[in-house]
Amino acid sequence: MKKQVQHRQSIDLARFCAAFGVVFSHAFPTTEDWVGHLSVGLFLILTAFLAMQSMQRAGGRYGFVARAQKLVVPWLLWSAFFRVVDLVVSDTADRFILLENPWTLLIGSSIHLWFLPFIMGAMAFVQPVGRQINSPARLIRACAGLVALSVPFFWAHDRLGLPEPLPQWLIALPVYLLGLVMGIAQAMGRPLPTLAAAAGMSLVAYIVTGGAPWFFTPLAAVLVFEALWRLPMQARFLPALGQAAFGIYLLHPFMMLVVYKLFGSGVAPMFSAVAAFLMSWAGVVVARKIPLVARLM
């Protein structure tokens, strides 16, 4: 294992911006939704990259099981919370049928919760990837392997019509693995192989999906990461922004409903995006001061 890369506060800003991008995309729903795809891709890259940094700081050890267990309670409670919200705001006759779709057991009633069970499983790859890729030659082979892996995953996402959250996971896993490899590549001082892998993965996505709106996600997320990574930023408030990002992601669907309740469904999309984002941020700040609630963020 190479010497770890020191944490840079520009990454905290990147996490915060990615959270806003997700909120923004939900306020401006379109078939293209390039902001949402880029933001989720960046979230995946950053989550994996920071996990690899954590392993490097621990001398090559990563407590996957313990970390996954810490996410179980937040996952279950958030799923229950959004299920209750769905029962309150929905007027459909089938809203009380809990197992109409068994896959909802993984995500509750809100699809954005696909991220929590995905991360619980994906963390299992951190230590094996970190230990196996220990030379420039293995780095290059791993990057080539990511491009090859993306072919069946992206094809299955586009062609098989699988139930949610499987389509999200099929895109997310290759991108998450790319983020892990980026953590190693940066420590080696060799970012070009991962940039080439991202370009290859986007090309694969374009070919196998016929130019689906998300095909650019791997390359765009890596380019944004690389640009922000190089910004010489240092400020006391930046770590707090990064720490709030995931909580904002979790809270924003509820806050979006609050905005629509207060201002009506015809509210300007930009206003609803900014208002829901700021309300979610404020909610996270307050929640993190309450010990029992802080672990849910």
Where would I find each of the regions flagged by the language model?
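Short, amphipathic, aromatic/basic-enriched membrane-interface segments that mark the entry/exit
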Residues: 4-12, 107-113, 163-167, 185-192, ...
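Specific transmembrane alpha-helix
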Residues: 40-54, 115-130, 155-189, 215-233, ...
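Alpha-helical transmembrane segments and terminal signal-anchor/GPI-anchor hydrophobic tails
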Residues: 152-153, 157-158, 169-175, 184-239, ...
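Hydrophobic, well-ordered secondary-structure elements that form the walls
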Residues: 241, 252, 287
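Discrete transmembrane alpha-helix packing/kink hotspots characteristic
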Residues: 252-255, 279
